[in-house]
Amino acid sequence: MELSLPEPRKSPPESVDKNKQYELFTTFFSKDPRDLSNTIELWDAIPKYAVSPRQQNASRDDNWRLPVHVQEFEYRPSHLDTAPVTCRLKVQPASIEIKPGKFMDFYPSTDEELIEEVLKKIFADQQYGMHSVAGNESWVRFTLYMIQKELKTRGKSRSIDEIKRSLEIMSQAVVEVEFQGQAKRLRYTNLLLSDLTRMTRNDYLQDPKGMWYGRLPAIVSKSINELTYRQFNYATLMSLPTPLSRWFHKRLSHQYTNAGLLHPYQIKFSTIERDSGLLHHSRRSANMKDIDVALNELIKRNVLLNISSKEERRGREIVDVLYVLHAHPDFVSEVKAANARQRDHRLTLSKVGRGTI
């Protein structure tokens, strides 16, 4: 089953007009913005990195091929008071040449998740990003060394060859999301990193300052234009050891906007299982243990103060578990700063629209 791409290859514009949307995206409410980045509405809710390398190894056929990965999840627009939208995700794997004439399929996974976060962080430095409001497109410029250095700084070291392979996977894997339950079903199809332009060794020898560039997903550009992103603690995210702990952190950072001692965040096991795609064990007890480990990592990093859980039973059978998460004061302060930034940015953009600044 092939997933088609919506448009032909593009090249980045030579220049774009300065715009308030990109300026706001790169402006953080903090004395030190180096540890901050942005969560992206919808994009970060898509469980596109959920298939582990171990699962991929078990799923490949004798020709090293993988099927299209299919998963359902729910997405609730944080800026709208509406019911959750049921979504169907398809991920077409990338076919990577691992040795001359030999190709192996890969789904995007943990390494690609981390590199995406690094690229978004690099993009937030205006020296390395370009954003067109009218064209709804965003470009990032980078070198392999920039990515490697940032990953090492954050305790997630990868070799140059590993980074190059991840970029190839991101530039080939196709993500399709179908939004269901509507009179007219909407479908979004895109690469994780479009129009990737690479620097070869000969290119580097001729121009050591030459850079790679790629186009970020249209959903990211749309979020920048509409101010539906949120400031969050990028340093904390990158310090977390597992995909599930990072999933919790980003979900809390984007959705838990009323964080406080009197307002715990509640989430069910079934919701975690459906929306993260990261509970891979056949036994529920093993998956519950993974959740406990992930949540305790958030306690260690002052995201959560404490957690409690309540089993929902049908007779002797556990049918679901409700987790009640209490925010740490440090996280509450971060959420308040993110809320203040969002209010300020919306006010600023409304003034731009009225022509008052």
Model region roles, listed by residue range:
Residues 1-357:
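Charged, alpha-helix-forming regions
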